[in-house]
Amino acid sequence: MKICVGLSGGVDSSVAALLLKRQGYDVFAMFMQNWHDTEGTLHGDCEWEEDRFVAEMVARKIGIPFYFVDLSREYRAKVVDYMFDEYAKGRTPNPDVLCNSEIKFDAFLEAARKLGADMVATGHYCRKETLPDGTCRILAGTDPNKDQSYFLCQLNQEQLSSAMFPIGDLLKPEVRRLAAEADLPSADKKDSQGICFVGKVDLPVFLQQKLKSCEGDVVEVFDAWYEQSEKYALDCSLLGVPVENLSDEDLLELSRPLDYSGIQFETETYRSGKKHIKKTRYKPNPYAVIAGRHEGAQFYTMGQRKGLGIGGHSKPIFVISTDVASNRVYVGEGEDHKGLMRRCLRILPEEVHWIRPSEKMEPGQMRRYKVRIRYRQPLQDALLICRENGLFVLFDLTQRSITAGQFAVWYALDGEMLGSGVIQY
């Protein structure tokens, strides 16, 4: 069997190649370039040339052929353009998930097959099992601190049938040890950070290359607003209703985020100084205050703390909502601010993906799974409720910063990743 290893220059893919070679497979390595910064769209420490050099040295050390493939056109069309589009809508995409489903196990797989590969192997910390009928299961990696199954949540059966994850049963220290013992050039290389196969990037600068800056208000919302909010009161009451009694509209209501657009600020005139110069100011508002300015609501994301430039508080300030239509960013004080906390999210029917189609839920069904809404989040107990108007995830405990555009991923008790979907809200 001929196997192509996606060699990135990092220690994980290097050890994956090493193990396959030792196991007697016919192995070759291929490095993919996913970006040409010819238009100045990205300014960052991408270091892809150094990564390629290290990858080639690793392949030479192991004794396997090395190839290079340029997938920058596919990456721009399927990942980068999608990122810009989502941020422009006020959503927060996950490019690493798309990089795997659209690039590594699609365009890269196709390129590998042209070189005669039967399978593609990567350095992901996850496990794959093949059932007697040929169906593939994907499970969390053995190392709980490095499990990367989340990033593979959009893979389908065809892709999984051609995938191998040689280090899925190993712990990170074991991988480092194997690399050091084999004297691989990547043994001491730090784990990669930043956008998948592009590198460490200043994201606001990256986005501003394509998305226009536009100043707007940063509005701090006080607890008093929630005390008078009918929507907030309704959500609290619906959470007390038995799940089987919740209608489709009830679930929609629970999953919808709070709407702060009704917060308005009136102005008044006053005279200042010895010359009694006439000036204008905002009238005091018991529910909110204009706390600062920003350069564009699309550059901010739910739960964001850095880059707000708002001081004078005893607790940290977090983004609780953005409105790109009105170009407003809403913030709240404290990690437990009411605007950060929710228990229900919705995934549109067309956005629901089941890794094993046989596990697909039908409208009217409810199942309990373990769910995470971001990479490395501890798994959360939740009830999945399938209705005609979407798949709803109702968590047992309140969740912080449920973010539109991110992926919700659900697992069985044995660690099998069963499905995923883009969070609508």
Q: What do these predicted regions represent?
A:
Residues M1-Q154, M164, K172-E181, L246, ...:
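ATP-dependent adenylation/nucleotidyltransferase module used to activate substrates
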Residues A121-C126, R137-Y425:
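AMP-forming adenylation/ATP pyrophosphatase catalytic core
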